[in-house]
C-alpha cells in the first residue's frame, strides 16, 4: 500500500534535514485556530501541515507563535501594500478595475477596494507567499515585491529544496486569481 502524500509535512522534514534554519516545535491545532481567527484567514492545507510539523524561526521566517500582532499584520499586508505603492508611484493599474481615476486619492481608494476582494496571501519566508485557503494545497510559491511578482517554486517542498540547491526556474504556473495575472 502506498503511503499517503503529505506535502507540507514532507517539506518540513526536508527543511529540518537541511539544517539551514533554527526550528521550534510545530504549531498545535489550537495555535493554528487562534492565528486563523485573529487574522481572518485560513492556511492552505500544505502550509498548515508544514507549520504543524515544524516552525522555522530563523531570519525571514514568520514566527507565528512569538511574533507580535503588529509584525504579523504587517507581513500579511505587504502584498497589498506593495500593489498600492505601485499604484501611487509606478502607475500600476489592473485592467479589470476599469478606468483609472485621475485623482491619486481616488485611484488609491479604488485600488484598495479592489484589492480587498483578491485572494489573501500568507507569508512563507521573506517576501515569498502562498495563497490562503482551506482545502487547497500545491500552489506555487510567489515572490512579491510591490507589483513585481514571480513564481519562485512549484510548491512548498520545491521552495524548501531551492533554499540550498540552485535550480532552473520553476515551470509552474501561478494559480491564484489576480496575483497570477501579474507574474513576470
Predicted regions and their residues:
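A surface-exposed partner-binding patch
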Residues: 1-116, 122, 126
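A short acidic (Asp/Glu
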Residues: 35, 134-135
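Residues in flexible loops and secondary-structure boundaries
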Residues: 49-51, 132, 150-152
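A generic structural signal for short, non-catalytic loop/turn and secondary-structure boundary residues
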Residues: 114-117, 135-137
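Acidic, serine/threonine- and proline-rich low-complexity regulatory tracts
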Residues: 126, 131-133
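Glycine-rich, aromatic-bearing surface loops/beta-hairpins
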Residues: 136-183
